[in-house]
UniProtKB/Swiss-Prot annotation:
Residues 50-69 are annotated as: Disordered. This is Small ribosomal subunit protein bS21. PANTHER family: MITOCHONDRIAL 28S RIBOSOMAL PROTEIN S21, SMALL RIBOSOMAL SUBUNIT PROTEIN BS21. Belongs to the bacterial ribosomal protein bS21 family. Keywords: Ribonucleoprotein, Ribosomal protein. One of its GO terms (molecular function) is structural constituent of ribosome. NCBIfam families: S21p. It comes from Borreliella burgdorferi (strain ATCC 35210 / DSM 4680 / CIP 102532 / B31) (Borrelia burgdorferi). GO terms for cellular component: ribonucleoprotein complex; ribosome. The keyword Membrane does not apply.
């Protein structure tokens, strides 16, 4: 659980920014969005395979660019 204590002299907007940073650091929003809707295991597997292929293609493109220089 993320908690932020606001001091008497502290600006509220500064505390809000600190809160947002803490949430991003703990990846709460990302996890919430991931679990918002049920995904079948097969759908998850297909997404992971597509992401892997995209990353591999990107690595190949970068490698080709380096060798062409």
């Amino acid at each position: 659980m993320v908690t932020v204590t606001v001091d008497k002299n502290e600006n509220l907007e500064k505390a809000l920014k600190r809160f947002k940073r803490m949430i991003e650091k703990e990846a709460i929003i990302r996890e919430w969005k991931r679990r918002e809707y049920y995904e079948k295991p097969s759908t998850i597997r297909v997404k992971k395979e597509k992401a892997f292929k995209r990353k591999q293609a990107k690595k190949v493109r970068k490698l080709k660019q380096k060798t062409n220089r």
